[in-house]
Structure formats: C-alpha cells, structure tokens
Amino acid sequence: MQKDKGLDEIDRRILRVLRKQARLANNELAEKVGLSPSPCWTRVRRLEDAGYIDSYVAVLNQAQLGLGDTVIIEVTLDRHDEDQIQKFGQALAELPEVLEAYLTTGEYDYFIKVAVDGTAGYERFLRERLYKVPGIRHSRSSFALKCLKRELSPVP
C-alpha cells in the first residue's frame, strides 16, 4: 500500500476502530468492519507492515495517576542555533511530566504539553525541572480547563 493512496474505505474503517479499541480480538474487529476474520487479519498486518499503524498503546488516566491537570507551555529560547535547539529538545524528552513537545514556527519556539498535580505540582515542575534547562528566555503557560477532543491520529 502506498501512503494514503493505498487506503480504501475498509482500511480506513479498520484504522478508525483500532484507534478507539486497539485491544479488540480479530473476530470482533472483522465483524465491526464487515469482513471475515482471515481477510481482516491480512489487512491489519498489511497496514502494520506499510507503517500506517506504528504501535498499540494504553492511554492512561492522568487523574487516576495523580496528574489530573494539563498545562500548555509556550517557550522562547534565548538562542536559535542548532546546538541549542537540539539540547533543549533532548532535555524536554527526558522530563517525565512532558506528554508532547513540538518545535514550532511563530512567536514561540516550543509548544509543550505537560501533566501535573494542580498549581503546586506545576510550580514544582517549573522550578525543579523546566527552568533548570538552560536557554529559556521566556515562557507562557495556560491550564487546560477541559479536554474537548483527544485523538492520537486522524484517519482520512
């Protein structure tokens, strides 16, 4: 299968179902997408081999883990040379509270999503972790009030 052009409607149905219920048994998946089990299994393997499915993951409940607050942080670095960008990105990857981090265009250099336990947990994260990473000139933060949509990946 080629990138996207190789996906037919059945492939898309398989991806949509697996995106929500990755632990479904093949028989159940086949029933949901209107195939018999053998062709369904073949299609799933083909989607995996072609790179459409990277992995199967458990989405953890942040609140149950004591990290019920999501904070979006925008960061501007004091320098923009390759070394600084690489070191800052590596440092972010090592911080356990960081759920996602993006190098971006625009007013800020990085968009970072973190999970913390309230304002005290966020203050601790800033003081003990993020602000110890060298090179930050400015940051701006917003607490997420409510998650309206969360998808790991869209299906065209």
Where are these regions (language model features)?
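A compositional/biophysical signature of low hydrophobicity enriched in polar/charged and small residues
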Residues: 1-156
